[in-house]
Structures are given as structure tokens and as C-alpha cells.
Curated annotation (Swiss-Prot):
Cofactors required: Zn(2+)
Official protein name in the record: Protein SprT
Limits of the SprT-like domain: 12-157
Protein family according to the UniProt entry: Belongs to the SprT family.
UniProt-listed NCBIfam families: PRK04860.1
The organism's place on the tree of life at top rank: Bacteria
Annotated organism of origin: Pseudomonas fluorescens (strain SBW25)
A molecular function GO annotation: zinc ion binding
Pfam families linked to this entry: SprT-like
SMART domains per record: SprT
PROSITE patterns in the record: ZINC_PROTEASE
Main location: cytoplasm
Lineage: Bacteria, Pseudomonadati, Pseudomonadota, Gammaproteobacteria, Pseudomonadales
Keyword vocabulary terms for this entry: Cytoplasm, Metal-binding, Zinc
Length: 164
């Protein structure tokens, strides 16, 4: 999987070098990105980070568009310096002129939300549930108390959990 990604990064740099008739410093490439972002270019570290899950699920479009998008950020930074907008004219010029791709700011990949466990707490005064995150539930285990806003009584764990 990373071989194709590295090959595409190199191809993008070769295209830019041919277009601008100069060489560019190659970045370090990492697949350590999670969440909603498909890719991130760290300009000062000369580092590209890509989301392996989104790459696996959308590999063809990812290789074509996302890799070029992130490489274009590094090329724009090396060519035009610090004082440019992330998706400004310079970056758009590279996307259109060098890679002949639309300068799309955001991807449209479907991002699966991670499942979260909620711990159900109740108050003696009302028939209401208070779903706690695992972090807050852990704080209760360490002795922290949470109070009902209505009656000021301590919320009590019911033993129930819910996956959302």
C-alpha cells in the first residue's frame, strides 16, 4: 500500500520539477493521520501525513487528487515562501497548471465515525439519564463527584452502557 503512495508523491514532484524547471526537496511521508482529514502537509518539517483508512477506502481518487493536493502545498511553500494563503492563488496555480486537477479544498470521502461507549448515570430526583464519556466515567472511579443541576444530588452509575 505505501509503495503506490510514495510512487505518486515522487511522480508529483517530478511533474512539478519538469513544469518549473528546478528541483524540490523531497518530504518524509507518513501514514499516521486519523480522523476526518485525508492528508496534511507540514511545511516547515517538509512532511506529508496521510490517513490510511481513507486511502484504503478511496485509493484511486486519493492517489490522484489528495496526494497532488498535499504535494502542491509543499511546492507552493518552496516556491513562494511563507506569506501565501494555504489554498490561495499560488496553490491553485500548481493544482491547475502542474497537475491539471481541480483545486478542491476539501475531500468528499465518507468518514466513519468511531463508536463511542457511554456510561449511564442517574439522579434520584428525576427520570433522566446522564450519558458519561469513558473519560468522565474514569474520573468518577478516581473519586470525582458529579451533581444533578436540579436537585444537587450526586449522580450514580446504573451499571448500563450504550454504544453510539
Amino acid at each position: 500500500m505505501p509503495e503506490q503512495l510514495n510512487t505518486r508523491v515522487e511522480d508529483c514532484f517530478l511533474q512539478a520539477e519538469s513544469f518549473f524547471k528546478r528541483s524540490f526537496k523531497r518530504p518524509q511521508v507518513s501514514l499516521k493521520l486519523r480522523g476526518q482529514k485525508a492528508g496534511v502537509a507540514h511545511l516547515h518539517e517538509n512532511l506529508l501525513r496521510f490517513n490510511p483508512q481513507l486511502y484504503r477506502e478511496n485509493s484511486q481518487h486519493f492517489l490522484k487528487q489528495t496526494v497532488a493536493h498535499e504535494v502542491a502545498h509543499l511546492i507552493a511553500h518552496q516556491l513562494f515562501g511563507e506569506r501565501i494563503q494555504p489554498h490561495g492563488e499560488e496553490w491553485q496555480l500548481i493544482m491547475r497548471g502542474v497537475y491539471e486537477l481541480p483545486p478542491d479544498r476539501c475531500h468528499t470521502y465518507e468518514v466513519k465515525r468511531r463508536q463511542v461507549t457511554r456510561y449511564i448515570y442517574r439522579c434520584p430526583c428525576a427520570d433522566s439519564d446522564f450519558p458519561f464519556s469513558s473519560q468522565r466515567h474514569g474520573m468518577v472511579a478516581q473519586g470525582r463527584r458529579y451533581l444533578c443541576r436540579r436537585c444537587r444530588q450526586t449522580l450514580v452509575f446504573t451499571g448500563e452502557t450504550r454504544v453510539e
